Amino acid sequence: MSAKKSYLKVWRGLAGAAGSCARVFSKKSLARRDRRDQLPFALFLFGLVGAVFQWFLYGNWLSGIVSEYTVAAFFGGFSIVLPILLIGFSIWLFRNPQKTHDNIRVSIGLFMFSSFSAAFLHFSAGFPYPSSGIRILSTAGGIIGWLVGLPLTTLPSYLAKTVCIIFIVLSVSVISKTPISKIVRVIFRYAKWLFNSDSVKTSPNSSVSSSSEHQELTGRDMPDTAGDNRHDETVTVLSGTSLTGSPVSEYRGESSDYALPSLDILNSYPPVKHDDAENEKVITALSGVLRQFSVNARFSGFSRGPTVTQYELELGEGVKVERIIALTKNISYAVASDKVSILSPIPGKSAIGIEIPNKKRELVALGSVLQSIHPDAHPMTVGLGKDSSGGFVLTNLTTMPHLLVAGATGSGKSSFVNSMITSILLRAHPSQVRLVLIDPKRVELAIYSGVPHLITPIVTDPKKASEVLQWVVKEMERRYDDLASFGFRHIDDFNLAVRAKKIASDSRELTPYPYLLVIVDELADLMLVAAKDVEESIVRITQLARASGIHIVLATQRPSVNVVTGLIKANVPSRLAFAVSSLVDSRVILDRPGAEKLVGQGDGLFLPISAGKPIRIQSSWVTENEILRVVEYVKSQAHPDYYVLEVQNQGNIDSHIGDDMPLLLKATELVINSQLGSTSMLQRKLRVGFAKAGRLMDLMESMGIVGPGQGSKAREVLVTPQDLDSTLARISASVSDSKLD
């Protein structure tokens, strides 16, 4: 009896060791109680023994006899492939023992694939019957091939083989959960490549097409929800479309010598080793809460992300989801954390997710995220970071099409903006993407000054920021005029036609339009100075600019209703919320609670346009030294080509000043020297009434000397004392010119 127990102990130990090896590179950790390693270990051994006999001892008389009367007797010539299927299926079971439905599906698919492959071989060998002898059967399709093919013997051989091929394709669809249409497309594409290789080699799009089809086969088009198969995928693609689109080379204009920076310019960090003991303690504490309140539920596993670990809880029969949600405070008490979030259900699973912050957080380096982006991906593709299961999260800014970012101080909002801009600098040519950076805080984006992607110097003056946004609106209208004139609906189609020289203009030379990305680092400062003008421009851009290739990212520390107005929210469909201070702020940015429970430092909730629920991510991190290296590199490749932004002032200079000209000049000199735009000060110093002082202040506002009124506060003076003489000369000249007109 003791010997039997010893054998069982050794067997379990070997199975556990094999399972641990199979799970080394898995993104998902498994609790010990959920591991089922003995069955997959047995399959692995069968596959290993089969590989030895079928491959390495091929031609040996003993190997031939053993194979002939065992596996080859059942599957015939297909038995040479069976070791691969057995070993692959065993690794799948090692990693996913709790996915009962998926395991049954894969088992059925593999059996279908093996059976109909054997039947196809049996028809190819002339369909011998068992009476022909075991030796002939083992060289054809075996007993399985004969049984499966027997109902098809009434058909001609070529039709029977066609039916077998159809079922083989169907089995691949069952195994991979991929639509048959995509599998057929891939088969035809490779068949075309095989029989027409010369034409494919000369096609400039062949490599992109094959990579695109590979993404279709593996299911990496944009998933409807971020949770589908997240443990099986290392990359999650968000925001509506696949990232590949057109290759980078199609976006480059006539520019030539510019070379994109290598990703080696960014820092590399060693992978973090996780300790499952900490997660086991949490599961023990959570299980204690369930027992204490008599809740029939069990934990089926956990997924460790960089910031939080998601524990999967399967409910027993008759247990309401509301019971788990009602225990949130008790769970927080048990794990000693006030940042517990409950996801009910986990998208794509019949399980509840309990997200608990890790005691030791993982740094998500921007370099590692960008390494996961396909080289031919869209130039506006950026790496957001990692999700709660540890998979990389990517998004295409053109499909968002606009983004609203909010978070309190220290939440990681500015770090995300830096990562996004750095991603663009690393992956996009200046002729592909141009940037408009608006930084009212003056210090956040100053590091990017002089990069060739800028279309105008970094804007730090809120008053000028309003004018720049008006210029963006005019640029959008110019692009739409071209689209309408030449009959295109999107700027990409227009650019392709221009590069192919399919269209031309008599009045000017047509050139491709670059994407224009507008980034506002602090929306609240702009809304404080010129709320009406800023909101009007932002709403125009967000309503209409998508097809013209113009996209805007709005970031703010204060997601209050007077900053993020209803019109702005309605037209900016994608949201990214970092940690905020209150439930009210979370509802403003996401229209739901959740952001108030984030732990800060890059922990965020991303709600793309195509997702029903926000996805928890850890934003990627890039250091200031890395940014400096990237900026210095791109500045060494090209110089910025600034546009002249011609924007007409909202106010009109009143030329009918009459006898007030001397007073206006005195008022201008007084305001600029004192740097105080106060109407009451003009009343006292110039000894004029309130109406006259107010008129003088309005005239100075129309001339860009002072900013708009701010209630009882003094107006901001926009001209420095060093520019006093030139300003006085400009006033005199403008009034004289208007009189001549």
Curated annotation (Swiss-Prot):
Subcellular location: Cell membrane
Bilayer disposition of the protein: Multi-pass membrane protein
One GO MF term attached to the UniProt entry: DNA binding
Annotated SMART domains: AAA, Ftsk_gamma
GO biological process: cell division; chromosome segregation
Keyword Ribosomal protein on entry: no
Basic and acidic residues bias (residue ranges): 213-232
A UniProt-annotated Pfam family: FtsK_alpha
Biased composition (Low complexity): 200-212
Transmembrane region(s): 39-59, 74-94, 108-128, 136-156, 163-183
UniProt domain FtsK: residue ranges: 390-587
Alphabetically ordered keywords of this record: ATP-binding, Cell cycle, Cell division, Cell membrane, Chromosome partition, DNA-binding, Membrane, Nucleotide-binding, Transmembrane, Transmembrane helix
Binding site for ATP: 410-415
InterPro entries cross-referenced by the UniProt entry: AAA+_ATPase, FtsK/SpoIIIE/SftA, FtsK_alpha, FtsK_dom, Ftsk_gamma, P-loop_NTPase, WH-like_DNA-bd_sf, WH_DNA-bd_sf
Region (Disordered): 200-232
GO cellular component: plasma membrane
Function statement: Essential cell division protein that coordinates cell division and chromosome segregation. The N-terminus is involved in assembly of the cell-division machinery. The C-terminus functions as a DNA motor that moves dsDNA in an ATP-dependent manner towards the dif recombination site, which is located within the replication terminus region. Required for activation of the Xer recombinase, allowing activation of chromosome unlinking by recombination.
Record text on subunit structure and interactions: Homohexamer. Forms a ring that surrounds DNA.
Record remark: domains: Consists of an N-terminal domain, which is sufficient for the localization to the septal ring and is required for cell division, followed by a linker domain, and a C-terminal domain, which forms the translocation motor involved in chromosome segregation. The C-terminal domain can be further subdivided into alpha, beta and gamma subdomains. The alpha and beta subdomains form the DNA pump, and the gamma subdomain is a regulatory subdomain.
Family that this chain belongs to: Belongs to the FtsK/SpoIIIE/SftA family.
Name assigned to this protein: DNA translocase FtsK
Species: Tropheryma whipplei (strain TW08/27)
